[in-house]
Amino acid sequence: MSQLALSKDSWSSQKVFVLAAVGSAVGLGNLWKFPYITGENGGGAFVLVYLACVLLIGIPILFSELALGRAGKANPVQAMANLARENGASKLWVLLGINGVLAGALILSFYTVIAGWSVSYFVESLKGGFVAIDSTGVSEHFSALLASPLQLIFWHTLVTVFTMFVVAKGVKSGIEKTINFMMPGLLLILLVLLGYATTTGAFGQSFSFLFNPDFSKLSWQAVLTAMGHAFFTLSLGVGALMVYGSYLPKKYSIVKAGLWIAFADTAVALLAGLVIFSIVFANGLEPGSGPGLLFQTLPIAFGEMTGGWFFGTLFFALVVMAALSSAMSLIEPAVSWFDQNWGIKRVKAAWILGALIWLIGLGTALSFNEWSGVHFLGERTFFDSLDFVTANIMLPLGGLLIAVFAAWALKPEVRSLELPMSDSMSKAFLFSLKWVTPIAIIVVFASNLVESNNLLLVIAVSLAIYGGYVWNNKRQ
């Protein structure tokens, strides 16, 4: 790969970059996963642990991934090739970039299907389909959607085509223009819904649930879940922030932008939690009802409440915007790689990759109906297998390698140039990057893959390997 394969695109302003990166981070995880895992793990105590994990694990990797992208000046694969050469590191570090590009593309192949559910629900809500609906009606609607391959494939196709259309137009004409409309719209809708939440009569209960910690309800599994979600929610390890960082001019501060990204992502998750739990509690429903919270519990609430058609439609518009803004960032690393390294123009690259992702996505769409009895990894469906490999292997591995490279392989002067900080902040950042972040990721990584009776052994072996790498690195 040539050193000359550098990013020619750039963001028009730091504000647009922050909006795009926030759009990448704010997705279904904020509106779907965060509320239900908070509900399942006791509320306030879980939120407190989650915020600590964002600070100690998420932000160091966020800074590092953006810095590697800008210092490498290219897509994740080429950026790591450039950085390995410039810093005297092994050529194998290019695998970090390849892992991110593949992870993003694979996640998008099932993300478009799940995002399609939200588009379907937005349309159904707009038509008044959830007005006065009861729990049986919602359950039947959701089951009918999942049982229909044609419906799932239609919505999957719609989301895929939209995503590729935007990305094919480029950074300024496509992603920037879409984000400039979508992110302010998302924030406005969220604030309108928050205003409504204060009138439900359950806002105080919702606030107490989210922010009053009860540590008696906090388990070790809840801590692991908080650590894992803090890592995944910021869109780390899929190459999105690395390629977005490569478009960031040197005059803009990564540290300042990174803090805004982390703050905005966390704020959206917490505000969405306040909105969702206010509506759930006001209707006497359960906060810890799993993934069905978004697609089964909330439609019941909207169906029963005054103004439910309007606020339900607004809510699902919010979900659609969050899903689409993340979808664009998941494929951008691969499109940029095709364009810069393989000489395939952006428009052609986007549609070629879109076709491949659409084909893989068919497996996910069929996993809920025709292929529900077809198993790949153990007893997992095609969708569950893809989700398991990306979420439990590829993303943690990517995050771990980003932390290791930024902490030990990147020259200190390069790190200081990209991430200028005060001495105290720099020391805290480097300590977290070298020790806290890798150890936390190793623990989460192992807990997701290994049976509990072998967990401590695997963690000990993994930490010994990491310690060996550090010792060898210091000797050189």
Residue ranges and their predicted role:
Residues M1-W32, I59-L66, R70-I98, P249-S253, ...:
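Membrane-interface "cap" regions at the ends of multi-pass membrane proteins
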Residues S2-K8, A115-A147, Y247-K251, K256, ...:
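Helix-loop-helix connectors at the membrane interface of multi-pass transporters/channels
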Residues V16-V18, S24, I153-F154, A264-L270, ...:
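Loop-to-transmembrane helix boundary motifs in multi-pass membrane proteins
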Residues S2-S7, W11-S13, E176, N180-L324, ...:
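Membrane-embedded translocation segments of transport machinery
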Residues A5-S10, I37-N41, A71-N99, T112-A168, ...:
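Inter-helical loop and helix-membrane interface segments of multi-pass membrane transporters/permeases
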Residues S12, L19-G29, G104-L108, T112, ...:
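Hydrophobic, membrane-embedded alpha-helices of multi-pass small-molecule transporters
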Residues T381-L401, S426-Q476:
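A generic transmembrane alpha-helix motif of multi-pass inner-membrane proteins
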Residues V16-C53, G239-G245, V255-L259, F263-A264, ...:
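Transmembrane helix-boundary motif of multi-pass solute transporters/channels
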